[in-house]
């Protein structure tokens, strides 16, 4: 296990902990991901950047040496995404948490709106939109506050855990299920939303999602479709 030096003042907790997970991510994409966090209007003490390297063939820290003073790096044997995120949760000291996949990145201009909602309204959770294009319109709209139950009565669930900036106090021991192949996000985010008593949502597209033909959501083989349906059924009936 490798750790970079964490220079954060231990006397005060950061506002947001960003949990970046990576496994054999392209070097340029991983650096762009880290840089997108560092460009935000958060001081060094207001942010915590945790990179969980889930068994990459070559240590991801090798391409992040320029950022060692800005992040905490942990390398572990490959245990899949859920375990990597759970590791990040256990380490995070921030009041709020944000998951970022290592090949994606935050869209600065619109993510700032989400940070403003946190600063001025102290919500339990901010729900924002994802984009497959790096060019997005500015947005400063929002709805809320409402409870998670009220939100779910009028909206469909968006499973991806990267679409939420949420207060750590919502977790109450909640973690990602490690036995599922596909529906771990849906189970986690549904419970997270239902725990929320002070939820805000915005149309701001604040997260760039890189589509891959090999990703779980794009697997077309009957076996993979069946596994996803089985996992989804278990989540619904749980």
Predicted feature locations:
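Nucleotide-sugar donor-binding/catalytic module of glycosyltransferases
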Residues: 1-230
């Amino acid at each position: 296990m490798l750790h970079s030096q964490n220079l954060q003042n231990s006397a005060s907790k950061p506002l947001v902990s960003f949990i970046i997970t990576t496994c054999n991510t392209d070097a340029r994409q991983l650096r762009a991901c880290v840089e997108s966090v560092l460009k935000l209007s958060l001081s060094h003490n207001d942010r915590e950047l945790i990179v969980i390297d889930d068994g990459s063939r070559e240590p991801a820290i090798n391409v992040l040496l320029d950022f060692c003073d800005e992040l905490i790096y942990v390398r572990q044997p490959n245990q899949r995404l859920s375990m990597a995120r759970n590791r990040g949760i256990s380490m995070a000291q921030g009041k709020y948490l944000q998951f970022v996949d290592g090949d994606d990145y935050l869209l600065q201009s619109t993510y700032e709106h989400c940070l403003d909602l946190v600063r001025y309204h102290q919500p339990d959770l901010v729900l924002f939109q994802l984009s497959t294009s790096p060019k997005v319109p500015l947005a400063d709209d929002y709805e809320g506050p409402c409870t998670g139950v009220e939100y779910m009565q009028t909206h469909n669930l968006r499973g991806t855990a990267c679409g939420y900036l949420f207060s750590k106090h919502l977790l109450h021991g909640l973690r990602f299920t490690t036995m599922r192949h596909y529906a771990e996000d849906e189970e986690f985010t549904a419970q997270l939303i239902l725990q929320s008593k002070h939820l805000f949502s915005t149309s701001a597209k604040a997260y760039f999602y890189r589509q891959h033909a090999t990703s779980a959501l794009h697997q077309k083989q009957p076996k993979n479709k069946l596994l996803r349906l089985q996992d989804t059924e278990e989540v619904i009936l749980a």
